[in-house]
C-alpha cells in the first residue's frame, strides 16, 4: 500500500525509535546539556520555534517545540543534525528528539 508523504512522516516516530542520551554523538550530548542550562548557544537560530510542519512529532500548539543545532563535523553550514525539544519551559522540556537528517526522521531522547 502506498502512503502519501504526510502519512509516512507521521508514522516515522515510533517508540522503538528512542535513543539513549549516551548513544547520541558527542556534539548532540553537548547541545542537550546546553539546553538544560539555558545556553549559551552557538547559532542565532538555536531556541527558535520549530513549527512541526512535517507532522513527524506529536501534535502540540505552535510554540511548544524549539530547535537547536547539533554541529556536523566538516559542514560549512548548520548541517542536518538538530535537537527539537518541547515543553513550556525551554530549560526543562517535556521531551526532546534528535534528527540526523534534517527533520525526515526523529528519535525520542531517553535518559
Regions found by a protein language model. Give the residues of each.
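C-terminal segment of classical bacterial N-terminal signal peptides
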Residues: 1-7
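N-terminal secretory signal peptides
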Residues: 7-58
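Functional cores of ribonucleases/endoribonucleases
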Residues: 39-111
Amino acid at each position: 500500500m502506498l502512503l502519501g508523504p504526510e502519512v509516512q512522516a507521521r508514522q516515522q516516530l515510533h517508540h522503538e525509535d528512542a535513543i539513549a542520551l549516551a548513544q547520541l554523538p558527542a556534539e548532540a550530548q553537548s547541545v542537550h546539556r546546553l539546553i538544560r542550562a539555558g545556553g549559551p548557544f552557538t547559532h542565532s537560530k538555536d531556541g527558535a520555534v520549530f513549527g512541526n510542519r512535517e507532522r513527524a512529532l506529536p501534535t502540540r500548539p505552535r510554540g511548544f517545540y524549539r530547535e537547536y543545532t547539533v554541529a556536523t563535523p566538516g559542514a560549512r553550514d548548520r548541517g542536518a543534525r538538530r535537537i527539537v525539544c518541547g515543553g513550556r519551559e525551554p530549560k526543562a522540556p517535556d521531551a526532546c528528539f534528535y534528527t540526523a537528517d534534517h527533520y525526515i526522521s526523529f528519535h525520542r531522547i531517553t535518559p
